[in-house]
Amino acid sequence: MTARQDDQANEGYQHRSVLLDAAVDYLVTDENGRYVDATFGRGGHSRLILGKLGQGGQLLGIDKDPEAIAVARELASGDSRFQWYHGSFAELDLALERQGWSQVDGVLMDLGVSSPQLDDASRGFSFMRDGPLDMRMNPQQEPSAAQWLAEADEREIADVIWRYGEERFSRRIARLVVERRQEQPIETTRQLAELVAEAVPKKEKHKHPATRAFQAIRIFINRELEDLEAGLAAAVDRLAPGGRLVVISFHSLEDRLVKRFMRDLARGPKLPKGIPVTAEQEESGFQLIGKASKANEQEITENVRARSAVMRVLERKAN
């Protein structure tokens, strides 16, 4: 899953997963291991993982988007090593229990909204294409962005746009939303984008004024940060010795959460001062692998949306 809200105008782009080769190279350490692509999308990472696995290897693809699962079904029909689970990676424990897997050798998370989702106007993620104001990764869940904006009070709207979009003009946007919805329902992406552009001064040359507001509403509607916290915790609990968690994030809120989570695990447990402990008790069971990685110039040239991608890798130490 590669495309992100900060740039949605690249019409000629053909979907290709960001940091594709690097992520899979870090992830696959055993060709006969068990792996999870926790954000299957359109299968870019999964296909490359399967290409690196031997006949004894297994891969589980997870996604909450029914359109992604349709692609996963097709892949599973042609490769017995691949299985799929329809749901959020926050449900990783349940997904693995259904597979009968107690541990895995690696989990890959490629966060945010995918290029196909952004490029499909009917999904309502993009302010560059007019469509219904939906923004749900799983259309079966409630509410849609339009429903929420119709019902939420001004304070809640402002808080969401500030918390998840870090938008300085969140209160001004919220006030205008409440005013305009009394005149007519805000039901399309164009309506919302024009409203936000009216409320927010256009200071950043290459960024649409609605970027932060759209990001914030999408994150809130899909519970992205809550799911991320749950998914990270479940992933490390299920890692076998030597297993790796590879996470690609696309905005600072995600990356700060991932960075803090991995750093704290690698540092080891916080133990009370003055209490005798063994070296084993002080040592962390995890280690960071390399430094944070970013897309190279070629990837950014091929897909300008890759410019904000950051990849981090955590490994459970072998016994």
UniProtKB/Swiss-Prot annotation:
A GO biological process held by the record: rRNA base methylation
Organism ancestry: Bacteria, Pseudomonadati, Pseudomonadota, Gammaproteobacteria, Pseudomonadales
Swiss-Prot/TrEMBL keywords: Cytoplasm, Methyltransferase, rRNA processing, S-adenosyl-L-methionine, Transferase
Protein name per its UniProtKB record: Ribosomal RNA small subunit methyltransferase H
GO molecular function: rRNA (cytosine-N4-)-methyltransferase activity
Residues where S-adenosyl-L-methionine binds: 43-45, 63, 89, 110, 117
InterPro entries with a match to the protein in the record: RsmH, SAM-dep_MeTrfase_MraW_recog, SAM-dependent_MTases_sf
EC main group: transferase
Organism: Marinobacter nauticus (strain ATCC 700491 / DSM 11845 / VT8) (Marinobacter aquaeolei)
